[in-house]
Amino acid sequence: MIASELELLSDKLDEVAMRKIRPQDKIIELIYTHLSMIKEVVVRNGNLRAEFFRNIWMVEKVRKNFDEDEIDLFRKVYTEGKLQGEFDIDNIDLVADITHYCIKGLEVPYIYGRLGHGMTEEMSKPLVAKVVYGALGKVRR
């Protein structure tokens, strides 16, 4: 069950990455798509929720391919952004890894509503973008 849910999430992330929008916007959309879809899957699926938190090693094993695909997706968007002058990144592989693991670390607080408590997505997006753009060396235009 977890594998099929991760496949749906992966497909959705691929759709976001293929959009004809600026790389800086893609990164923010990828972050929010990842978190909202993980939450949706866990909330929708009671036994998956229990399994998700009880047997983390099994989940990590199932997630391995998804995680690798997501990191690769970040690499592609960061490369695109660097080539377009949107990002000032010295090591794309490292930044893609860091991005993936930061988002992964936010999953549980996001699922439980502990991230940006009381804020809507519309309220939090500009703040998240500011943090992300700062890390990517984004120059404001």
Tell where the protein language model's regions lie, with residue ranges.
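Short secondary-structure transition hinges
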Residues: 29, 35-75, 83
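Hydrophobic alpha-helical connector segments
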Residues: 4, 11-40, 95-99, 125
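A glycine-rich, basic-preceded beta-loop-alpha segment at the flavin cofactor/substrate interface
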Residues: 1
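Hydrophobic recognition helices of helix-based DNA-binding modules
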Residues: 5, 9, 13, 38, ...
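Hydrophobic/aromatic-rich alpha-helical bundle segments in the mid-to-C-terminal region
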Residues: 46-53, 60, 82-129, 139-141
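Residue-level signal for short amphipathic helical patches enriched in basic/charged
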Residues: 4, 69, 90
